[in-house]
Amino acid sequence: MAKTLYEKLFDAHVVYEAQNETPLLYIDRHLVHEVTSPQAFDGLRAHGRPVRQPGKTFATMDHNVSTQTKDINASGEMARIQMQELIKNCKAFGVELYDLNHPYQGIVHVMGPEQGVTLPGMTIVCGDSHTATHGAFGALAFGIGTSEVEHVLATQTLKQGRAKTMKIEVKGTAAPGITAKDIVLAIIGKTGSAGGTGHVVEFCGEAIRNLSMEGRMTLCNMAIEMGAKAGLVAPDDTTFNYVKGRLHAPKGSDFDDAVAYWKTLKTDDGATFDTVVTLQAEDIAPQVTWGTNPGQVISVNDNIPDPASFADPVERASAEKALAYMGLKPGIPLTDVAIDKVFIGSCTNSRIEDLRAAAEIAKGRKVAPGVQALVVPGSGPVKAQAEAEGLDKIFIEAGFEWRLPGCSMCLAMNNDRLNPGERCASTSNRNFEGRQGRGGRTHLVSPAMAAAAAVTGHFADIRSIK
């Protein structure tokens, strides 16, 4: 029987399945951070259980960390406690930890791929909703809750029901300057923020194949923002070339054997999907969200929509509420909207390719008066590579702040946050009310678009910036 990539991955990991019971899946990799793990480790301790597979469990600090100092006390008491608990727990249970002083420390979804922890064909979980990022490698990756974190630590398995399947095909070639972030925002604009609910999404088509691994990670990272359980891209030579030589990747003949298997990880001809969505890449312009969910998105040269233009009463009410929160009036050009802060970073857009794109816009320009702009590399290795290429100097000379790795302003769990009423052009993944700080107003954009907003002081079309 012809199978989709998702069905192949799922079926290959079923440990036990009985009639009318949820299947039990084997988990190949478990990624851990400081926020969702303390209670899980406490549960193990209370029952006298070890971590079943410490060699398949990898931990880092990212959510709470300060991006201005490596001092564990810098982000407040709760953050300090969570980070100290992670240090204690990893030591007690034999789990490898990339702490604040480790050169590999960084955002968990940046660290995993760059260390070769993430490999095609795997099941990967983490107590974090954006675990979908790792699906870019043709791995079945999804976020789990703290009680499930404990279950995986104890058993290396997880009960998981089968999801519906969705194919999103992006046909043709994207125009110059159009990034994976623009593509995924355009997709969510079409599906809505709940269009993928109950599904695992496979992204395919020429425009997807043309993306780098960094771009594919951006794409799969935001699959969750359309309500999907996970996102997938079938592995190919781009994947294999990225993985080869990384710390935890197979070596020598083992790598060749792995690639032979990885090449089978694709949807069979004749396999059917429950839902199919198609977009034309050439129709996609630079995207900017205007509302309070990622599906409320328009092209940069569009006007802020009028809620009255939405036929669906729920969408209309949502638009009215969003515009009130965002402090925007219908009909005004998006390019007239001024910004206060810019955040370039997060598990969506903090990799070297993202920083290069932003630096290209920043080079030879200055951050607009009154704008604070942060650039936060996703990991120690990304930071080191950017500095080796001189990107830090470009940013600093332009007036951007060059920070230490961490989740930073993506979420208000550390010192980097918006004040009430402040408007931010952000390369992160969520523009919910209060996501970047109470009363903060978030607009999601690509790294180049964020840099353009920083130097102009408002949203600007990168295609018109020479």
UniProtKB/Swiss-Prot annotation:
InterPro entries listed in its UniProt record: 3-IsopropMal_deHydase_lsu, Acnase/IPM_dHydase_lsu_aba_1/3, Acoase/IPM_deHydtase_lsu_aba, Aconitase_4Fe-4S_BS, Aconitase_4Fe-4S_dom, IPM_dehydratase_rel_enz, IPMI_cat
Keyword list, A-Z: 4Fe-4S, Amino-acid biosynthesis, Branched-chain amino acid biosynthesis, Iron, Iron-sulfur, Leucine biosynthesis, Lyase, Metal-binding
Disulfide bonds: none
Cofactor binding comment, as recorded: Binds 1 [4Fe-4S] cluster per subunit.
GO annotation terms (biological process): L-leucine biosynthetic process
Positions that bind [4Fe-4S] cluster: C347, C407, C410
Pathway(s): Amino-acid biosynthesis; L-leucine biosynthesis; L-leucine from 3-methyl-2-oxobutanoate: step 2/4
Catalytic activity line of the entry: (2R,3S)-3-isopropylmalate = (2S)-2-isopropylmalate
Cofactors demanded by this protein: [4Fe-4S] cluster
EC number: 4.2.1.33
Residue runs in coiled coils: none
Single GO molecular function: 4 iron, 4 sulfur cluster binding
Family: Belongs to the aconitase/IPM isomerase family. LeuC type 1 subfamily.
Function: Catalyzes the isomerization between 2-isopropylmalate and 3-isopropylmalate, via the formation of 2-isopropylmaleate.
Subunit structure: Heterodimer of LeuC and LeuD.
Protein name: 3-isopropylmalate dehydratase large subunit
Lineage: Bacteria, Pseudomonadati, Pseudomonadota, Gammaproteobacteria, Enterobacterales
